[in-house]
UniProtKB/Swiss-Prot annotation:
Alphabetical list of SUPFAM superfamilies matching this protein: dUTPase-like
Cystine residue pairs: none
Family from the record: Belongs to the dCTP deaminase family.
Species name: Pyrobaculum calidifontis (strain DSM 21063 / JCM 11548 / VA1)
Transmembrane segment boundaries: none
Catalytic function, reaction form: dCTP + H2O + H(+) = dUTP + NH4(+)
Pfam families cross-referenced by the UniProt entry: DCD (PF22769)
Binding site for dCTP: 99-104, 115, 163
Protein task: Catalyzes the deamination of dCTP to dUTP.
HAMAP family: dCTP_deaminase (MF_00146)
Listed name of the protein: dCTP deaminase
EC number: 3.5.4.13
Subunit structure comment from the entry: Homotrimer.
Length: 176
């Protein structure tokens, strides 16, 4: 079941869903709009051979940029972080979607689930499928998070729990 704005406001007022900061225009008809944070990550090198299964840590592959603008080269991607720190209830998951206006410029994100019980800034991959450089601004609404009720409860125990700022991927050594 997708939660409406009334249900979202109720969860926020009860302290079950936390969004900090919470802007007046964040709670929409069927989800939350989240804003671009103050940093992003982009690959530090072009043409490198990346083997996720051989990596303990992928952070050295990325350059973190602190800026008021996010520059996304043509046919490339960046990792963006939300300005908001989100704490999900243990019985609510989120489905992250790019705002449709940005998709019409040629941007996309992969299907992304924000797990029940997740807490932290959300790091999301934004792909520029267009032939043009696209520049986004810090603080603009870019991510629409649709919240859905999960059956039962679960605790999130993932590697990204409590992340702050943009978080490059973990290495997959030992998982492959």
């Amino acid at each position: 079941m997708i939660l409406s704005n009334d249900e979202l406001k109720k969860l926020i007022s009860l302290g079950k869903l936390k969004v900090d900061p919470l802007y007046p225009d964040a709670v929409r008809e069927n989800g939350l709009d989240l804003r671009i944070g103050g940093e992003y990550a982009i690959y530090a090198y072009e043409g490198a051979v990346v083997r996720p299964c051989d990596l303990d840590d992928a952070k050295p592959l990325f350059r973190v940029v602190k800026a008021d603008e996010v520059v996304i080269p043509p046919r490339n991607f960046v990792l963006l972080t939300t300005e908001e720190y989100v704490k999900m209830p243990e019985d609510v998951a989120g489905l992250a979607n790019l705002r449709s206006t940005l998709a019409r410029y040629g941007l996309s994100i992969p299907p992304t689930v924000v797990d029940v019980g997740f807490e932290g800034n959300i790091t999301i991959e934004v792909v520029n499928n267009s032939p043009n450089t696209i520049v986004l601004k810090r603080g603009m609404r870019f991510l629409h998070l649709v919240l859905i009720k999960a059956e039962g409860r679960a605790a999130y125990r993932g590697a990204y729990q409590g992340q702050r700022g943009v978080t490059p991927p973990k290495g997959l050594k030992g998982e492959c």
